[in-house]
Every structure is written in structure tokens, then in C-alpha cells.
Amino acid sequence: MEPRLRVFELARELGVDSKRVLEVLQSLNVDVKNHMSTIDQKTAEKVTDAVRRTEAQEGQGAGKSAAKSAKPAAQPKPTREANPAKTSLLEDFFGSGTRPQRPLSEKRERRPLTERRPLAERRPLAERPLVDRPVTERPLAERPAAELRPGAAKAAAPARPAAEAQPVAERRAPAEAAQAAQAERRPAEKAQPAAAAKAAPPEKAGAAPVPGAVAEQKQAATPAAAEQKPAGKAEQTAGAAQAKPARAEAGTGASSRPASAAPAAQGEKRPAAAAERREEPQAEAPQTSGPSRPVPAGPGQPARPAGSGIGVPVKPAAGGKSGLGLPTRPGEKAADGARGGGSGIGLPVKPAAGQGTAARAGGLGLPQKPKAGAPRPGGGLGAPQRPGRRGAPLAIPKLDPKVAEQAKAGEGKPRYGQSGDKRRADLYDRREHPSSQPSEEKLFGQRPKRKASAQERRVLKPITVTGPMSVKDLAHEMGVTAAEVIKTLLTGFGIMATINQELDVDTCVLVASEFGVEATVEQKEDIIEVYDRVEDPDEPAELKKPRHPVVTIMGHVDHGKTSLLDAIRQAKVAAGEAGGITQHIGAYEVELNGRKITFLDTPGHEAFTAMRARGANVTDIAVLVVAADDSVMPQTVESINHAKAANVPILVAINKIDKPEANPQRVMQDLTQYGLVPEEWGGDTIMVPVSAKQKTNLDLLLENILVLAEVSDLKANPDKPAAGTILEAALDKARGPVATVLVQAGTLNTGDVFVAGTSWGRVRAMFDHRGRKLKSAGPSTPVRVLGFDSVPQAGDVFRVTPDEKTARAIAEKRIAKAQAERLAQKAISLDDFMNQVAQGEIKDLNVIVKADVQGSVEAIRGQLEKLRNEEVKVKVIHAGVGAISESDVMLAVASKAIIIGFNVRPDDRASRAADEHGIDVRTYSVIYDIVDDIEAAMKGMLKPKIEEVILGKAEVRETFKVPKVGMAAGCMVIQGKVTRNARYRLIRDGVVVWDGEINALRRFKDEVREVSEGYECGITLQNFHDFKRGDILEAYELQEIKAG
């Protein structure tokens, strides 16, 4: 949308009241309400032209009266003076490049020049008093401007010593100048647009004359020059020039061009900007007749040509170079030491060396950046002329229809069409006026260059796809916008995606190919998979150091595993176990001859199969304990299978050899059936007969364990972040979640951040198996760790992470993955369950399990899930660690479940809630008791067996019709009895024709409950009336027979 400008902003730039602009708008039939209304570019230009035209007409009479008056004119208002630090808003709006035929920056510089607007109409030139000035009486015929302005050139009388060098006879009268200008006006009009845009060597101009130079110039001025100076100008002093430097009218471009008091030498180089414009092709301006006047710069200095306000070069005449200064506004004083003011569109000229900054040649009428130590002069819009060429200030082209026609026809070149001028002006604006820079979309200006589209900005370089990527990331990698990727997915693949939706690898490759980008698939290892491993397979072997072995005690129930370990480590552990059965993994360290051995005690019965499997995976040597009196049992076989699956060497300890019925040879014979051949029989399995009770051969057992460890060459790298396995986890009311961790690689230190499964945390404290606090733990060391955010799962991999952010991210990803898997499983099982319920094939016994440690929870869950038969199964809907809470009771209420607690008790609130809702809460200390009770409950829930009992039979002897009832059958009970509430089936020729209930059973006219054998009765059936003689009505009922 085209930018718009408010009325009060336009009025402020035009220097008039908003009311006046509103009147002009109303006269132009533009619908505006107040000064806050907005107008477009064309309307603003129309208003600007109308206001200028009106001001010019009003100021024409004022200019003439001011010329006739000998009294010096009043100083212009401060608001009319140029402000070098300000950039016109209209210039921002109508800057270069928006109107090639006439940049609006000219309008900005012409704004305060209201009296001089119709200068082209004021003729003859004799009416202007400014012709009496010494330098302004040049023949105007030499000015190739489109419109010659009478008395257009003014000189700073006292500052210009050129009066001595110029003969009075050469100064033409205004009438002569007008006649000469009339002859050359037409060719000048054609050359003016192109010439105005070209840069000639700039005329030297000082922003503020140095006092010393001003004094020298005053001494060099001739009496004739002083006589020709108007009375109103004679009062100007050098002091005034020092106090107030010559400034340009910023709104109009009129500039008082101070002459250079000490011009540079003839060989001085021009600025780069002027040099660039000199090299550009210039339209030849017509040569003018009449003598040219050199402008001496000072005593002993070579003369420099004077530049015209419009930059139209004039060929120099013989004898020197000449130039013409630009006139100031009527009634305005020129500063001493400065040349007469320029026209409304002139540019200040280049100063001599040491005299300040020259106006940029061919510039945009903006204030120029001063050199060091010199004030900024005002700037105009014209370009300085070439040496020796004269020119006159260009009249406002808006009022000249010929200039407009030339611009429309393309004859003239835009003044600011040169890219160099525009680039230099824009650069100056950015340096000097950062606050006045227009926005990207210039108001009333040309649309900025279109940014390169995503298609153009695309870098067609290969990308690497390491995994699923979101639409946003894929678009960023390819250098396109997300909208393009979404569009391609929809149109090319029919996928409706959002910006954050993840795309799989194959889709990413296909989308990249649609954009012409080569995609390489590189499978990046998932961070979860990295932290799921304990050992690094790529770790160099030279970094590993020897470590002590980890030994697992395995075997059948009550074969003496814990007793043997207790005997080894000299601690009474078995006495603390409920029922003498180990309930969860214990990890202990023993030392023999300075060498350590870590023992893991795993429960032996089949309920702890999963725990035993984990124990086998973390161990180096498996000690299989077999009782000499029981020999091989089912759990013994299972232990052998787990050890072989984990590739763990097995050492057999034949326990209880002190018993009279012990038979070690039988044990060895039975083990050979499972691939364990003793060394005595030529095998490779070490078998040691021991007695845990008598502590027989314990040292021999330990020595053999160390021998196997040496053969296995156990090594680990202790100089890396720790990694291990969670052996056991529990929730301690005082210390929170606590876990037993076996460090398998690296060194675990207090303060390390870790992740284990879906839990993470920081090591707050570590304790060994004796309860001593540790600061670090190396490989093969079991420790109890505090600092988990939640209770981890037994068997989870424990890994130290670089920071908490990484640990939290891994845990959250694992939680999300587990939830997704659980939801998927629930969806499938729910569908199956609903089908089974609809068919009446299955029933569930919902159970909530709470235990003291995670290992017990898993053991109970596994044991209960095995308790099922053809019609009933146990469904564990929740299992956790800790005391039975009120939330567990509420869950049991909602799911109609029973609560089982193992080594835990319900709290007070949970007990009250259970009593209130009638929830069955049972607590146990031995797992086998749980199994027995659940089996009994399942028997009570078995679907009862339905048996059909025949009550009696009746034969249809007669049929008759009963009003309002239908057909009735007159029957004779031939067997048993028939009752009112029994079910009946109608049998005809051995085929059941109908089955259902009867409507009525009558004997004569009375309703009866039953009719015995040998009696007659009348029977009507529900929805059946087609009785026939000989049909048999069989009465029966269904009875439930409970399973024993």
C-alpha cells in the first residue's frame, strides 16, 4: 500500500499553517477532516505546487517594494534558515529516484523562497536593486538556464576582491543582460537538464570566513566595488561574519556561498565526488559572449573560477576564468568574506584548502559534513560548473511547462538520476542524520528493492539428515521458508503438516529432492541408546586397568546361598530375612589376601527369575550352590541357563556336605546332564564341596574364584564418568529414593549428575555395604546412592552425565517413550478385553501391589500374572514401592481391585478410606502366602457351571380359542410336574419348535402355581399359538453348579 502523509506534517514542511493547507485541499476537492487526516503522494504534490504558487504571487510585490527601499531588510526568521542537522521530511518522502523529472528535494530547498518564486516573470532586471552589487552585474546572456532570473547572482561585496580585477566597463547593465539572455534562452533550456546533473570543478567556498582573511579581503576591495554595494549591505561587518557563518536556506536550497579567502593552488585535486562527475558525459552548453571575469582568491593566490548555482558550465574566455555567485534572498545580508547567496536550487561550492568543507558537487541539497575545524555550510541543489563556464540559477522547473514537457519526453536527464550522486547523498544522510532516515517503505517514495525470495536465496548445497526433523529445521537446513516446505508436503505428498511437526528420514529426503537439494542420510546414534550401554565398545584397551571380580551366588531355594555368603563375609544376614528367604538383592565386598571380591546375593526361587537374570548380566563369575542332599532342582537348572546365556563362567559349590544324607557324587552326576562336567572327570567346571554351617573349604572356594578372575582378565577404565547398573531400589521415608548401584566402569564421585532409566539426580551421598560414607567408588564397587528424583527400576543402567540438563532430557525422553509404548499396549489390550467381556469368555481380578523394594514388586507381579485359568486371570493394575496410600485406595475403589502389601502397611488415612469404601487390604511378609490367597479368591470367581434340570412333561390333547388371549392348549401332565415359573420348550416330532416362558397355567378357571403328573391343565404360551395335538411341552429350569 502506498504510504501516506498527514496534513500537519506537510504544513510544517511548507512553513504554513495547517489551516492554509486544509483550505487548499478543500479547493482541490479533497475530502479531509482536520490536520490529522492523511493524503497521498499526488495530492501532496498538488498542495505543494498550489502553496508555492500562492506564496510566489504574494511575495512578488513584497520583493519589488523591498528592492526599492534603501532600508536594510530585516533578518529572516530563524525558522527559514537552513539547519544542517535536519533532513526535510519531504525529502525522505519524495527523495531521489521517485520523480526523475524533478526530485522533490528541490522543492524542499525552495520552500522559504516565497518572494523569489516567480523570478522568471519579473522583468526588466532594472527594477531589482541588487544589480548595483559589484559582482552581480554580469551579462545574464552567458547563463544557459531554462529561465533567466533577473539579478540572479549576488556577490558578497566586501569579501570578494574580484572588484579590482574586473573593469567596470565589462559589467553589463541589466537591460543588456536581459537582451543577451533572450537570445540564448532556447538552447540553454535544452542543455540545462543534462548540464545540471553533471559535476564541474566545484567553486571554492568557505563555510565561515576566517577573521584574518576577511580583513585582507576588505583591504583588497576597490572603492568602485564599495560604491556599487547597496547601502543596505554596507553595514555588514567582519564581526557579524564571525558570529554567524553563512548558512544556506535548507528548505529552498538558497545558499550564501562564502568565497575562499585563501584558495588552493591551481594543481589542487578535486574531491572524488567531483572527479566522478567530471568523468561522466556532459551535455555541451552553448558558449556565451561577453568578457569573463576571473575571481582572484586573495593576494598571491591564483584565481579560481566561480561556479554557478545550477552547475551549467560556461566556456572560459581568454584572459582568465570567470564564475558567477548566486544571489541571496532580497533583504538578506551576506556575511563578510562570503560570496553572494545562491539561488533556490544552487549548491555551495568547494572551498579552498583550509577554508572548511565544500558542498558536494551534484549533491542533493543536504548540509555537508564539514572538515575538521570548520563549520558546516548550507547546501544547494545545483552542481558547480566547470572552469571558465558561467551559468545562472535555474528557475523552479515546476512553473515552466517547457521543462516539464522535456522531462516527460525524456529529453532531459533527471538531476538525481546518477547512481553516484544518490549513493553519496544517501551515505551522507546515514552518517549525519541517522534519526531522519526513512523506513524501508518510504512514505510517498519508491518501493524499495524487493528482497530476494526464498527460491533466490536457496543455497543448493547438500544437507545431512541424521534422523527425524521438524518442518522448521528442514526448511532452515535447505535455506527455504517453512511455508514452502509445508506447501510442498501438501501439494506433492498430500501431507498436512505444521511447522513443528516432525518428518521421518524418508520424507525429509523426498522433500529435499523436490527443492533440488541433495540429502545424505546419516544415522545418528540416539542419545538414549548411548546412555543405555554400560561399556563403550570403541574404548581403547590401553586405558583399562585390572579390577576385582563380581560374583553372583545362584541356586535353588533353601540350598544355602545366603548362609554360604554369610559364612564368607562373617555377617549374619540370613537371620534378618523373612522366613529365612532372601527377598531382594544384597551386594557385599570381602577381602582375601589383599584382594577384593564383590558378591551379589540373588533370590533363588523362580519368583525372582528376572532379578537373577539381571544379576547374571552384571556378574563376572557365577557360583552355583547345590545342596548335597537335594541335588539338582528346577531353579538350579534355571540358574544354569541364565549363566550360560550371559556367557558367565560357572563355579559349583556343593553345600551341606556335613549332613549324613549328603551325596556329592550324585550332584556331580546330575550336573553333567546340563553341560557342567567337573575337572576330576575331565571337564572344565570347578566344583568345590563346602559346608556353610561348618565353614569348610571356604578359602578353597575363594581361591578358585580368584583363579577364574585372573583367567577372565577383568579390566575397566577408572578415569571416565561412572557407569553401572541399578541392583536394587527402595523408597526410604527419611532419605527418599535409595538405590544400590554396582559401578562397572569409571569412578563415581559425590556430586556427580546421573541418569538411571526414567530417574535422574545428583549423588548426595554414597555408602558401602557396611554403612560407611564414601566420596568415590571405582569399578566393581557396590554402593548405596542417595539423590534420585524418583525410585528407579532394578536393572536400569546408571550413567553419569555432563550436566543436569542432559540428564533431565534423557529421563524425559525415556518417560515419553515408555508412555507411548504403554498407551499402545493399553489400546490393544482394551480392544481384546472388550471383545472377551462381550463374549463372556474371561474375567479379571484387579490387584494393586505395594512392596518395600522394587525387586519384590517385580517378583509379586510376575507370580500373580501366572495365576490364571481358562476363565479368570489376575490383572495387576498398579504396582509401586512404598506404603499403601489413600490414592491407592481410591484407585482400588474406581477399579474394584484388592490391595496387596508386601512388607508395608497402610497409613491412617488409607486405613480409614479402605474401611469407608469396603476395600480389601491385605498385607504379607512372605510371597507364597500372597499366591495362596489369590488362588483361593480366583476359585470363588470362577464362572459357575449351568445345568439344565427337567421338571416335567405335558402332552397337548386339545386346542381351543380363548377370547382376548388367543389359542390355548389343553394338556395332560405325563411326567413330573409343570410349574408357573419354569421355562418351557415345545417339541414336535423330536424338534424344538419354541422355547420360552408361559403366559398362564390354569386348572379349570383358576390360576395355579404347579400341576402334578396325571392332572389336566390349560397352558398359553408367549408369542406362540400354533398348537397341534401330540406336541410335547417340556418344563425345565437352569441351576448353577459351583466348581469345587
From Swiss-Prot:
Pfam families: EF-G_D2, GTP_EFTU, IF-2, IF2_N. Residues 104-146, 267-281, 399-444 have a biased composition (Basic and acidic residues). Residues 580-584 are annotated as: G2. SUPFAM superfamilies: Initiation factor IF2/eIF5b, domain 3, P-loop containing nucleoside triphosphate hydrolases, Translation proteins. Residues 601-604 are annotated as: G3. GO terms for cellular component: cytosol. Residues 691-693 are annotated as: G5. Residues 57-77, 147-168, 190-231, 254-265, 352-375, 383-395 have a biased composition (Low complexity). Residues 555-562 are annotated as: G1. The keyword GTP-binding applies. Residues 546-714 form the tr-type G domain. Residues 55-458 are annotated as: Disordered. HAMAP family: IF_2_B (MF_00100_B). Belongs to the TRAFAC class translation factor GTPase superfamily. Classic translation factor GTPase family. IF-2 subfamily. One of the essential components for the initiation of protein synthesis. Protects formylmethionyl-tRNA from spontaneous hydrolysis and promotes its binding to the 30S ribosomal subunits. Also involved in the hydrolysis of GTP during the formation of the 70S ribosomal complex. This is Translation initiation factor IF-2. It comes from Symbiobacterium thermophilum (strain DSM 24528 / JCM 14929 / IAM 14863 / T). The lineage of its organism: Bacteria, Bacillati, Bacillota, Clostridia, Eubacteriales.
